[in-house]
């Protein structure tokens, strides 16, 4: 029996884009996972609830290695929503969807890093390390709900960081505007990292895993141009002249 659909309402299908964290692992995966664990330990809840895309572009791996990596990430509560740059031969049933055409967030001007792997005709084939970028500059304000994550070095924001936004840097953070959101410098263990901002109204600041919440900051520093640094296990702050 044929069922006739008489409901005049149509099914609405829309396309939307969402901000996702891109993880670009390096070989060997064991060493990369150690560095990831260190980041997660110093930034509690860092990956909790975040959409994550796994970029395996140009990595000489097979399906079993990819499945093992996804399983390791799952044990760390890192949920992979998609895989970019994977050869069709290494994908299989039960894996996250293959993605292509991804690009850096259009709101930001982030230097692109192309992975380089050189295969030599020698008994042991060793992939070269991906090129390291030491700093990035974001030339627009960072809006609520957005995240800038750059574990390789310093982050400079030519603008303000809204409440609910966050900056995570392996090095120092420079904000030429108001810091209302969260700023986490030295995320991979760089205790010498600093945070600089033109106007301090932060929800949270952290250096090398040491946190200070808004209510813990001296009242005389609120709304001021400030630099923050780590001294022992305490975050110190002073006004900028």
UniProtKB/Swiss-Prot annotation:
GO BP of this protein: cell morphogenesis; division septum assembly; regulation of cell septum assembly
Keyword terms of this UniProt record: Cell cycle, Cell division, Septation
Keyword Glycoprotein: no
The family this protein is said to belong to: Belongs to the MinC family.
Protein task: Cell division inhibitor that blocks the formation of polar Z ring septums. Rapidly oscillates between the poles of the cell to destabilize FtsZ filaments that have formed before they mature into polar Z rings. Prevents FtsZ polymerization.
Description of how the protein assembles with itself and partners: Interacts with MinD and FtsZ.
Protein name: Probable septum site-determining protein MinC
Gene source species: Rhizobium rhizogenes (strain K84 / ATCC BAA-868) (Agrobacterium radiobacter)
Taxonomic classification: Bacteria, Pseudomonadati, Pseudomonadota, Alphaproteobacteria, Hyphomicrobiales
